[in-house]
Amino acid sequence: MDKVLTHDAVINDLSSGMTIGIGGWGARRKPMSLIRAICQSDLKDLTLVSYGGPDVGLLCAHKKVKKLIFGFVSLDMIPLEAHFRISRQNNEIDVMELDEGMVQWGLRAAAMDLPFLPTRVGLGTDVLTHNPELKFVTSPYSDEENLVAMPALNLDVALLHVNKSDEKGNTQIVGPDPFFDELFAR
């Protein structure tokens, strides 16, 4: 079965209101041709999960984003992506700003088909103040430690940029990669 799709075919498989994970990290290894195709489409009210960069900025500039779940939105040398900043300051998008590790745990929970994963990440930070929907669990063991119950970040689809792929859907990322695209893809 040939899994090669055109940009138009990908866009036709997406629908407004979806939760879309976008791989890469900041400005690196983003599926920008697909992002541009979404910008030119009728899609709207998207929830994005991303370690954001120009992907988030373009989608915010084109009013495609309803909610953003993120660990950061940066262009590396430029610490804050400008279109995202404007959208956020003008309350044009809902945000769930998390610690980078919390995004990772949310993607891991979804990859393992679990409702949440317990973690210490975020304890003692304002992340919990700004996200009152996050819950806590108590360890059932003798320490009875109170932990964050990071909910699964379930995606409808993930958009990734890889170095190599084939018609069977196999992909390869060349070189050391500290990113979490394999979690987006599960």
Where are these regions (language model features)?
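Conserved alpha/beta enzyme-core scaffold
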Residues: 1-186
